[in-house]
Design a protein with these regions (language model features):
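A residue-level marker of the well-folded mature domains of exported/periplasmic proteins
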Residues: 1-191
Length: 191
């Protein structure tokens, strides 16, 4: 409402948690366009001046998956794991289209270079929870996962990987400084 009062006729929000507020404002100020990064309400609510958008991060996730698959192949070639042991763990925030799309792209990328790769997924039901994401990663590692990736926003999973010496593919943050021995690559949105 403050931005509309200042004369803005186009308003952007950049966090999943802002969607309901943006929708409410769109209904109140029908002559202003509201664009929300992520979300689904533009499709379900059908408010003409309310829009959802998201970056094509699935493309970066596919490439990150290729890097993960290459690492798995390296581990197989060095005798660190068997082809049957090429098990990826994935810490997902929610069972939600954005997360599932990124996870699927990542897995397809990994499988494109390491056909024996499998993947187990654990959801935290939170976008950002360091302790919960770390716990999920540790559980996946204890379940035999030899590489961890994530679609959650904290450094919890990378820190677990560094502690356990397990390669990590991060999301939306660089983990090189916090996991210098295990960080492989990260997909990051550059709006």
């Amino acid at each position: 409402a403050e931005l509309v009062d200042e004369g803005c006729d186009l308003v952007f929000a950049d966090s999943f948690g802002h969607e309901s507020y943006m929708l409410q404002a769109a209904k109140e100020f029908t002559d202003v366009q509201f664009c929300h990064a992520t979300g689904t309400m533009a499709h379900t609510e059908k408010v003409a001046n309310f829009h959802n958008a998201f970056a094509s991060i699935y493309e970066g996730r596919y490439l990150a998956g290729i890097a993960a698959g290459m690492k798995l192949n390296e581990m197989i070639e060095k005798g660190q794991i068997t082809a049957d042991g090429a098990k990826i763990g994935y810490v997902g925030a929610f069972d939600y289209a954005e997360v599932v799309s990124g996870m699927t792209s990542f897995y397809l990328g990994a499988r494109s270079v390491c056909e024996s790769a499998t993947m187990s997924v654990t959801y935290t039901n939170s976008w950002f929870d360091i302790a919960l994401e770390k716990e999920a990663a540790l559980s996946l590692i204890n379940d035999g996962c030899v590489l961890i990736s994530q679609h959650a926003d904290s450094e919890g999973a990378p820190k677990a990987c560094e502690e356990k010496g397990v390669p990590n593919v991060a999301y939306n943050i660089s983990t090189i400084s916090m996991a210098p021995n295990t960080a492989l690559i990260s997909s990051k949105i550059n709006w």
